[in-house]
Amino acid sequence: MESITVFSAGSFCYALQELSDIFRQIHHIEIKAFCGPAGILRQQIEQGNRGDIFISANPGNVLQLADSKKIYQKLTIAFNQLALTTLNLEHFRHKSIFELLFDRSFLGVKNVSKY
């Protein structure tokens, strides 16, 4: 079976797995995915590791590869957005979300479950 090698930022790993399964069923081509920090994957490509596709949420990584002539072409296919919210509780209503972000007393997790 033919294969495509993909270096992907860890944040895209779960979506890549789902897309890989569908792609394999339709095209009968295996996706070999290597997921991790995009900066480290970029360094591996710069050092000679070969892949067919590189996925990074940080356009700087892609630009570095383009500048060093390590990639043939680049394409932005999506943009991230960050949404911030708070619970509808009285003690959150007296500060803006940005104030809460920098107030360490509000940034804590009391109950963390094991995976």
UniProtKB/Swiss-Prot annotation:
State the InterPro entries in the record. Answer: ModA/WtpA (IPR050682)
Gene Ontology terms: cellular component: outer membrane-bounded periplasmic space
Pfam short name (any one): SBP_bac_11
Its BP terms in the Gene Ontology are: molybdate ion transport
GO MF terms here are: molybdate ion binding
Which protein is depicted?
A: Uncharacterized protein HI_1469
Species assigned in the record: Haemophilus influenzae (strain ATCC 51907 / DSM 11121 / KW20 / Rd)
